[in-house]
């Protein structure tokens, strides 16, 4: 395959014959360089790319802001769940676009992005948080490579994380003693109690816990079915699907939690009588949850986690409880700590890792092993005792 160069006005151009489309000839012509020699070099490079890939690659001259907005509208909004959309939007608006708003997409080099990562590290940003704000960049630039073909390679593929101390990734485990302090502060009858004990005894995510309704509990078989979550979007509450397909699961629960739930159900029924027409009921209109004291001609959902007057709990309210536990009880806590604690206590006491994987709703065992199990003093002691108990002769 050959091509040609020519000067037109003050600019040099190169062109070559591409493959026929629908039997018609197609010729590609592009600006090559300032001189004939530069243009001939550009022609050779274009011909080499075309002969290898069957297509000519042209870097798109688009700004970072315009491209990321395009990616968000055409990929994220169409393919990602609401919480992912919200998190990506936050990372874009708070970190990525303010940093790179004056750049064109083609100028996002590995060096530039590495400097950004290093700067955030030196500012004290944790590894997990840094990963969370870089995730949309990885996805967006991957999309720019294909199917958009705006850039040839993803510069995020070459980024290296600075060395973090191993302890930085340690997760908080709530001891039995600390959990008792928490439930002493928020005893049965206070609205935080039920979501806290469900999280502790099941390892469910906060959105899964507040999404549980009474028809998800089988008091005969001692099971809970996790099949939906609650999410807040633009000050409205919606029902959504769990995080992944593997998150849809039915798990066994013990007699302790079962008894608490039975007691709570009776307590809820008493409150319905106590508040009468002032009790707040929850109805579903497709995915939207409507709270009303009136009897609406919509399907009613009896959620487990409600306040005394029937008001539905939201993730933000539970997060506020976590901050109070941190400040008032001096216990490092967030709701996800209950999930880490649940998994670790199970493994520590000999539970089968596959059972733990299913219980947590993970898609594979490695996630369970890498993320939610931790070496505790009890594990360390038992490991030592294994060798102590081995025969020496």
Regions found by a protein language model. Give the residues of each.
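Catalytic-site neighborhood detector that most strongly recognizes the C-terminal catalytic loop/helix
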Residues: 165-166, 173, 230, 341, ...
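Short, basic (Lys/Arg/His-rich) helix/loop patches that form interaction surfaces
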Residues: 123, 184-189, 202, 251, ...
């Amino acid at each position: 395959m050959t091509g040609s160069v020519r000067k037109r006005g003050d600019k040099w151009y190169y062109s070559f014959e591409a493959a026929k489309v629908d039997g018609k000839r197609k010729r590609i012509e592009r600006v090559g360089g300032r001189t004939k020699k530069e243009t001939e070099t550009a022609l050779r490079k274009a011909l080499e790319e075309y002969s290898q890939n069957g297509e000519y690659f042209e870097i798109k001259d688009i700004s970072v802001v315009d491209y990321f907005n395009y990616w968000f509208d055409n990929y994220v909004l169409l393919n990602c769940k609401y919480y992912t959309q919200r998190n990506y939007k936050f990372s874009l608006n708070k970190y990525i676009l303010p940093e790179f708003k004056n750049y064109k997409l083609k100028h996002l080099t590995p060096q530039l992005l590495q400097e950004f990562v290093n700067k955030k590290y030196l500012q004290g940003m944790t590894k997990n948080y840094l990963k969370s704000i870089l995730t949309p960049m990885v996805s967006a630039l991957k999309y720019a490579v294909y199917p958009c073909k705006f850039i040839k390679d993803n510069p995020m593929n070459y980024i290296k994380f600075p060395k973090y101390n191993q302890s930085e990734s340690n997760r908080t485990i709530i001891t039995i003693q600390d959990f008792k302090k928490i439930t002493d502060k928020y005893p049965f009858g206070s609205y935080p109690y039920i979501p806290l004990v469900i999280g502790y005894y099941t390892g469910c995510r906060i959105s899964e816990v507040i999404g549980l309704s009474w028809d998800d509990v089988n008091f005969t078989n001692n099971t809970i079915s996790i099949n939906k979550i609650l999410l807040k979007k633009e000050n409205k509450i919606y029902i959504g699907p769990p995080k992944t397909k593997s998150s849809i699961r039915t798990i066994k629960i013990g007699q302790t939690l079962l008894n608490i739930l039975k007691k709570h159900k009776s307590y809820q029924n008493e409150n319905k009588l106590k508040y009468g027409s002032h009790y707040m009921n929850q109805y579903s209109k497709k995915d939207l949850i409507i709270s009303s004291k009136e009897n609406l001609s919509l399907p009613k959902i009896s959620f487990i986690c409600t306040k005394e007057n029937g008001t539905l709990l939201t993730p933000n309210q539970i997060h506020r409880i976590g901050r109070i536990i941190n400040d008032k009880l001096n216990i490092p806590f967030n709701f996800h700590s209950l999930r880490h604690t649940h998994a670790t206590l199970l493994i520590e006491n000999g539970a089968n890792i596959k059972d733990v994987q299913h219980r947590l709703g993970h898609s594979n065992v490695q996630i369970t092993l890498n993320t939610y199990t931790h070496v505790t003093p009890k594990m360390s002691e038992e490991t030592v005792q294994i060798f102590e108990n081995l025969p020496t002769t």
